Design a protein with these regions (language model features):
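Short coil-to-beta strand junction motifs in C2/discoidin
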Residues: 20-26, 35, 45-80, 120-122
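Extracellular beta-sheet/turn segments enriched in Thr/Pro/Gly and aliphatic residues
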Residues: 1-6, 38, 45, 69-70, ...
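Boundary/junction segments of secreted and surface-exposed precursor proteins
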Residues: 1-47, 165, 241-242
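Short Pro-Gly-centered beta-turn/loop motif in secreted/extracellular proteins
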Residues: 74, 108-123, 131-132
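Beta-strand signatures of extracellular beta-sandwich domains
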Residues: 79-85, 125-127
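Short acidic/polar inter-strand loop motif in beta-rich domains
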Residues: 130-142
Length: 242
């Protein structure tokens, strides 16, 4: 499974890689910040709160008991939430896991949380969510081959209806839209990039050295560069059912 986030993309997407600044600075959940100004983020995957309420314990595998970097791979960009659905409806979800997103777009499942008890003969829509990017879903159902389900979100646009948006095309690669930091204030907040996200940015603008929802670039700081990303995507929405 492969997916890219717009915010941390480097070289305008030409290399298909993202930054690892949150890892480098020690701001990922469970890490020890690398400077005295850094604010530590408690261990645990970040999707145990609204609107996801995912209670998985994948994040417990990464703590300072394993050292200041908490045992994360050195090329970790952030966490994502991955789900499988038998139809486009969220009610058809049969599996959900928190996973690491590596800087080349690879989604790496946490050891011991690799798979769910699912029908290997079934096909599934693959859904990827991120805490401040727009939800995305595979454009077709995907079959399981050799006990593995594979899909490259960067190679083709994702699911969309006549009105909704899939992903953004940057330098030949599709990426998830940045700017969706406020996902709980209204019924459609998790699938829209709008003024609510800008309002959240204002409340945290100037914050630095930690793990923030309005840090769309994923570099540990909330500043005007993050607002500029929101401006680019204001009005974009997904019709992936939530």
């Amino acid at each position: 499974l492969k997916v890219l986030l717009e915010g941390p993309i480097v070289d305008n997407g030409s290399t298909g890689t993202m930054t690892t600044k949150l890892f480098n600075l020690g701001y990922l959940p469970g890490q020890q910040p690398s400077t005295f100004l850094g604010i530590a983020t408690p261990a645990g995957q970040p999707y145990d709160t609204a609107p996801w309420f995912y209670a998985g314990s994948e994040g417990d595998a990464y703590t300072t008991a394993l050292g200041p970097k908490a045992g994360y791979p050195t090329n970790t960009t952030d966490w994502v939430l991955v789900s499988l659905r038998t139809s486009t409806s969220v009610s058809s979800t049969v599996c959900t896991k928190a996973a690491l997103l590596l800087n080349d777009g690879t989604v790496q499942m946490v050891s011991g949380f690799d798979c769910c008890d699912i029908d290997l003969n079934q096909t599934y829509f693959i859904v990827v969510e991120h805490r401040n990017h727009l939800i995305t879903m595979s454009h077709v159902k995907v079959a399981i081959t050799n006990n593995t389900i594979s899909y490259d979100f960067t190679a083709q646009n994702s699911y969309r209806s006549l009105l909704g948006y899939g992903q953004k095309l940057i330098n030949g690669k599709y990426v998830m839209y940045a700017g969706n930091g406020q996902q709980v204030i209204s019924s459609s907040a998790d699938t829209d990039i709008n003024s609510n996200d800008s309002d959240l940015w204002r409340t945290q603008n100037g914050s630095n050295s930690s793990y923030y929802l309005n840090d769309f670039e994923l570099n540990g700081d909330a500043n005007v560069q993050d607002k500029n990303l929101w401006l680019l995507n204001n009005g974009v929405f997904s019709d992936v059912p939530r």
